[in-house]
Amino acid sequence: MITSEHITGLILAGGRAQRMGGIDKGLIPFHGKALIESAISRLKPQVSTILINANRSITKYSHYGYPVLMDETPDFSGPLAGFSVGLKHCKTPYLLTSPCDSPLLPTDLAEKMASELEGNHLELVFASSKENDGKIWSQPVFCLMRSDLQDSLNSFLSKGDLKIDRWFKELRSSSVLFENSQAFANVNTPEELSALEKVLS
């Protein structure tokens, strides 16, 4: 049975945040503290340890007491670059990933994903959510993967492909449905930040 002791959490804070004017999203003030702190507090009980993937503000992120890992690929290559460096430094059998700007991430994220992965002998599972209109949306940056997938990912990246869904298709993978779509709400614009703050006010 997969438990929290078998899982390392990886918080992705390495993006450009172009729609936020290029500011570092993880450090945006949110209810009196940096946005990443909400992700840390929700992820921490679900994992044995945490890694942070960031490409700037390294000193500030290091103040949280967790290893801060920079991409080893150039030019902000997206979440797969973060996955790659996270897998390289993961010392547990599984890696659970989450973006830094989703302060409502599910508190049962690891539990539900571990059950799906283990029960169906999968290599990777990712979240999906049901929206108010009934549509199912993929949430691929929220995923649980075996930590022995580094060679597979590096081989994929060596082809110059950065599309997360295409890598998933090369694996034994599946999605896990979460009914609360708001749990995956993230911050891409100032308006979305304001809306999220109102949810928690």
Segment roles from a protein language model:
Residues 2-161, 166-185, 190-195, 199-200:
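Nucleotide and nucleotide-moiety/phosphate-recognizing core
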